[in-house]
Structure formats: C-alpha cells, structure tokens
Amino acid sequence: MMGMRAKKICMAMLLIVGGIMAVFLADRKVAEKITEEEYQRFLDGEVPAMKENGKTYFLEDLFGEDVSDVETFLSDIDGDGVKELHIRNGIYYILKEKKGKLTILYEGTAIYDEPVEAMSGILYYREGGAPYNETYYFTRFEKDGTMVEGPTYQCYDSDEDGEIGVEDLYLKDGVEQDRTAWEKETEIYRAIKNERGL
C-alpha cells in the first residue's frame, strides 16, 4: 500500500504535469490567435508574405488586383497543431508563420493540388490524353513546414482500349514498374481521388 508521503508526492506530480499541460495548451491557443490575426492582416493587404528567396509579396502581387474570388481556408497541413492559411485561385499557396515571419510554404496549382490534412500533405492528381494517362505525386510536410516530395507515379493507356489495364504502362519516377507494385504504392492516392471525385 502507498504511504501518505508517496500519495502526496504523486498528487504533487499530477498537479505539476497538469499545470504544464494547461500552460502548453494556453500558449498554443495564443499562438493560433496571433497567427490567425497575422493571416487576416495579409488578406487585408497590411503585411506581405515572404518566399524562401527572401522576396516579399502582398496578396495582390500573387493574384493580381481583383482578389474577390480568391478562396481562403485554414488547415493544419503540416501536423504541428497550428493551422496554415491556404489561398487559391488558379495558383495555390500555403502560408505559415515561421520564425516570426509570414512565409509562403508552398506554391502549386489549384486545379490539380488537393490538400490531405490527415496525411500532412498535398496530393497532385492530373488526367491527360493521347493516350489517356494519370499522374499522381504526394508532397508531405514536416512539422516545421519543410516539404518532402514523394515519387511521381504515372499510368498510360498504351494499348488505347479506353481503360487502364494489364497491357498498359506503369511508371514510377519515369521508370517502368510492375502493375501490382504500382497499384499497391498508389492505392491511397487513387482512393483519395475516387472519394473526393477528382
């Protein structure tokens, strides 16, 4: 049985851990509020965002004078617990506050890029013709916003029978790959494509 002193020590430790967690959660809420306020200042044209090359851009620099039809949303794409600002209209940008500066984390295409928060990344999917083909690649984000690009997967209806099947061409980073391996490696991407109707 636990003595009175051991019980007091356990209670003190629980209070300390609980206090640390409360401070951590409060700090995260404050960080999220400050970050969201900074995002709004960017959207209002008050502050610029910086690309990795050091150049700064206001919203109008990225999308032109008329920004009325620019889609914006918040999503924690890198899994750090703080939401990033996603803005798109033809071009797709993700902004994150890094080291006290609003930084453009990602630049892609709004037509082909699909955010997948559960996987901390962006799925690129595109269909093409002559012959029919599909391209997939996934860019994952580390918690600090660092991008990790995955392989590019392509399949071609090389026999031009109107469907991707056994006799067709499967590539991984431009190198022919066995259909079974290709299907296994792209299974999650194809499931996302089908689920979201891409």
Role assignments for model-derived ranges:
Residues G79-R88, S120-Y125:
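Acidic/hydrophobic-patterned starts of short beta strands in beta-sheet-rich repeat architectures
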Residues V17-D27:
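Hydrophobic alpha-helical membrane-insertion segments, chiefly the h-region
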Residues D27-R41, V47-P48, D61, Y125-L198:
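Acidic, small-residue rich beta-repeat scaffolds with periodic aromatic anchors
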Residues A31-V67, G100-E114:
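Blade-edge motifs of beta-propeller repeat domains
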Residues Y92-Y106, E117, F138-K143:
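Beta-propeller blade repeat segments, especially FG-GAP/WD-type strand-to-loop junctions
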Residues Y92-Y93, L102, G121-L123, T146-M147, ...:
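Hydrophobic residues embedded in beta-strands of well-ordered beta-sheets
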